[in-house]
Every structure is written in C-alpha cells, then in structure tokens.
Amino acid sequence: MDWYVGTEWEDKNRGLAKKVIGLQFTEMDKPTIISTVEFSVNKKATNLGGRPSKYLVSDESATYPQKHSLEMGTSLTAVDCYLELLLQQFVPGETAACSITTKTGERIEFELKLEKIVKNTQVEKLSAAEIYEVALRLKESGVATFKTFPKFAFDYFVRAAKLLITYKPFDKLTKKTNGINGQAVEELFIQIQTNLAACLLQEKRYEHVIYHTQFVETEESPSEKSIYRRALAYYHLKEFAKAQATIERMPNYEEKREFSKLRDNIAVSWKDSKAHYKEVVQRMFS
C-alpha cells in the first residue's frame, strides 16, 4: 500500500481537498453516509477563525492528537458537515492533510487520522424501520441547522426524503413485515417535505414549494406550517385565488396573525393586479 501515500482527493464544488501523508493499513473499506467512526485531529486547525466546530480548534494550548467519535449525519455546523464528507474518503489507518476553502478564499487546514470504522452498515441492507430511524436523525439535524446553516439543513432534508421515498407507496408497509407501519413513515415524509418547503421559500424557489406541498390538497388535516408555506408560495407566484383558497384550508385562520397578515397582503395585491390588468386592457383598446 506504499503507493497510496501521496494520493490526493478533491471536491472543487465544495472546496474540499485532502492528501494522504501516512497509512497504517488495516482494510480498504471507507465510511458510508451512515457510518460511525473514531478519528483523531493531529494538530490545531489554521484559519478556522470564529467558525464553530465540535471537532476542530485553533487553540494554541490544546493538546494533540485529539480523539473523537462521530456518527455521520449528526454534524450541526458547516465545518463539521464538510469534515464528515472528508472522512468518508478515508480508509482506516489513514492520515491526511485536509483543507476547506471558504467562499471568501480562506483555506482552513487541518490533519486527520481515521482510527477505525465502528459501524459501517450499507444503506441498501437496512430494513424499513432502520431507514426510518436514519431519516429521522437526518431530519432532526436539518431542523437544528436550519436557522444558522440553511443550505446544510436543505441537504439533510433532501437526504432524508430520498431514503424514505424508496418505500412509496407507504401503505404497503406493516409493523409485522417491515418493523414499522406505513402511516408513521408517511407522517415523517410529510414533515420533511414541509421542512424542504421552508428552505425553498428562503431561496425564492416558489414552484418547488408548490411541488413539495402537494399533500396539503389531499391530507385531511395538513399542518399549519405546510398550509402557510404553500399559500405564501402561491402569493409570490401571483396566483392569488389559489393562495386565498389554500389559506381557507386552515380552520379559524382569521384568528392567526401570520395567516391574517398574508390574507390582507393577498387582498391588496389581488386588487392591484386587477386594476393593472384593467388599465392595460383600456390602453390596448383606446
């Protein structure tokens, strides 16, 4: 395995890179997106600045190496999410010089060693109940990162949705056969779709919000958040009739501040839109 030392890996889109500087070879397996690993940080990180991280520090007084345990899909900061991606390119016993290049061009540098893979189950070998637990974990990580790191939250929600969607139609799942019933899986899937809608609203991708909240039209009692986000997307798309109809799916919407404010905005914009249309028509035929 001498040839492996010096091997380089790079993900230009994410600004990630690593170069192998040492190897105590044990096996060629690499961590998966659901693995649990033990790794060491061998020296202080450079150019970390004030960026939060559970694993990397730039403290001169810290002692090294620092050993950590990490379950993939649980990182709650941008730096640590990237650290997960880097570790997924390691083999056990590998030491590598790693870097994360930020949008401003700063290069955060650090040295990692993958001590061992504690748990390395392949996703395709998981049962429906196990997939549910992984998706739930990813969803919870997404919720925890949404306010501070929305793009990473979006990634967590997408990963969770992709895991669950393989079991559609959910009503085929039973507790006896699959370890979990379809209703529980569908409820989690709808929660994730609602969370995706929040991310997409931030990015002004309103058509995608409509797509991910289609269930609002068919569910007997869709959540308040899902109704509001769908109505807000219709409002921004200037589909005011649909926005108003969506709001009316919410019982006693008049008593809810956000809904009441959105309804008023819809009414004003709808009126202005009709007045503008009338003015355009008059100009055309005057």
Swiss-Prot record:
Topology class, membrane: Peripheral membrane protein
Summary of the knockout phenotype: Lethal. RNAi-mediated knockdown in the wing disrupts cell polarity. RNAi-mediated knockdown in clock cells, results in behavioral arrhythmicity and long periods. RNAi-mediated knockdown in the eye disrupts oscillations in the subcellular localizations of per and dco, leading to constitutively nuclear per and constitutively cytosolic dco in photoreceptor cells.
A GO BP annotation: regulation of intracellular protein transport
Signal peptide per UniProt: none
Main location: cytoplasm
A GO cellular-component term linked to this record: plasma membrane
Keywords: Cell membrane, Cytoplasm, Developmental protein, Membrane
InterPro entries in the record: Bdbt-like_TPR, FKBP4/5/8-like, FKBP_N_2, TPR-like_helical_dom_sf
GO molecular function: kinase activator activity
Localization (cell): Cytoplasm, Cytosol; Cell membrane
Pfam families, sorted: Bdbt-like_TPR, FKBP_N_2
Quaternary structure note: Interacts with dco (via nuclear localization signal). Interacts with Ankrd49; interaction promotes the stability of both complex members.
Function: Functions in planar polarity establishment and circadian rhythms by promoting the activity and localization of dco/dbt. Required for regulating the levels of dco/dbt and per in the nuclei of photoreceptor cells and thereby is involved in normal oscillations of the circadian clock proteins in the eye. In the dark, the cry circadian and rhodopsin visual pathways, activate the accumulation of the protein into Arr1- and Arr2-dependent cytosolic foci which are required for dco localization to photoreceptor nuclei.
Name the record gives this protein: Protein Bride of doubletime
Species per Swiss-Prot/TrEMBL record: Drosophila melanogaster (Fruit fly)
Gene it is expressed from: Bdbt
